[in-house]
Amino acid sequence: MRLTAKQVTWLKVCLHLAGLLPFLWLVWAINHGGLGADPVKDIQHFTGRTALKFLLAALLITPLARYAKQPLLIRTRRLLGLWCFAWATLHLTSYALLELGVNNLALLGKELITRPYLTLGIISWVILLALAFTSTQSMQRKLGKHWQQLHNFVYLVAILAPIHYLWSVKIISPQPLIYAGLAVLLLALRYKKLLSLFNRLRKQAHNKLSL
């Protein structure tokens, strides 16, 4: 039985709640001592993990819709992507304001360059910003064939973000490894498309070098 448009609308409502409830919990935890001994790090890791969860969920939609024969599920992909960007922005903001502090924001650029794991993080955020900004149907029509080329960069984020997470923790625990493993699995489901993209980029680079 296929999902109806009305059911997908209710599913979107549930996904909005899934994006909002972690924020409400975080606010409660901050005000009621629900965080650990290092609340700043806890906030950073919580916001980053939540962004990663929405990224993985967005990547899951296409294969799930295909294998379950539920084409209307695709309509939830943009929503998941926007929540991923929202949480990634909270993640970046928590680092800038809580780790560096308002008086040291001038150091942010230096930090992003000199710390490789932060470099990977900011590259991922910039890509997500571009994808969020161009996620509307009007931008899709305006960009034409370039729209899909741009949104293929989500696969780069799926590589960089788990590495950023693994690199940022001082002690490797199962959690970042699980996220990395899930990202690898979701990318493996698209190996034909990724191989095609790689061959196309390699061909374009070869043609430019030959000029």
Curated annotation (Swiss-Prot):
GO biological process, alphabetically ordered: protein repair
GO MF assignments: electron transfer activity; FMN binding; heme binding; metal ion binding; oxidoreductase activity, acting on diphenols and related substances as donors
Keywords attached to this entry: Cell inner membrane, Cell membrane, Electron transport, Flavoprotein, FMN, Heme, Iron, Membrane, Metal-binding, Transmembrane, Transmembrane helix, Transport
Cofactor: FMN; heme b
InterPro entries on file: Fe3_Rdtase_TM_dom, MsrQ-like
Cofactor comment text: Binds 1 FMN per subunit. Binds 1 heme b (iron(II)-protoporphyrin IX) group per subunit.
Transmembrane segments: 10-30, 54-74, 82-102, 116-136, 153-173, 178-198
GO cellular component, one term: plasma membrane
Family matches, as Pfam families: Ferric_reduct (PF01794)
Compartments where located: Cell inner membrane
Domain of life: Bacteria
Membrane topology per record: Multi-pass membrane protein
NCBIfam families: PRK05419.1-1, PRK05419.1-2, PRK05419.1-4
PANTHER family referenced in this protein's UniProt entry, alphabetically: PROTEIN-METHIONINE-SULFOXIDE REDUCTASE HEME-BINDING SUBUNIT MSRQ (PTHR36964:SF1)
Family of this protein: Belongs to the MsrQ family.
Primary role: Part of the MsrPQ system that repairs oxidized periplasmic proteins containing methionine sulfoxide residues (Met-O), using respiratory chain electrons. Thus protects these proteins from oxidative-stress damage caused by reactive species of oxygen and chlorine generated by the host defense mechanisms. MsrPQ is essential for the maintenance of envelope integrity under bleach stress, rescuing a wide series of structurally unrelated periplasmic proteins from methionine oxidation, including the primary periplasmic chaperone SurA and the lipoprotein Pal.
Subunit structure: Heterodimer of a catalytic subunit (MsrP) and a heme-binding subunit (MsrQ).
The protein's name: Protein-methionine-sulfoxide reductase heme-binding subunit MsrQ
Organism expressing this protein natively: Escherichia coli O6:H1 (strain CFT073 / ATCC 700928 / UPEC)
Lineage: Bacteria, Pseudomonadati, Pseudomonadota, Gammaproteobacteria, Enterobacterales
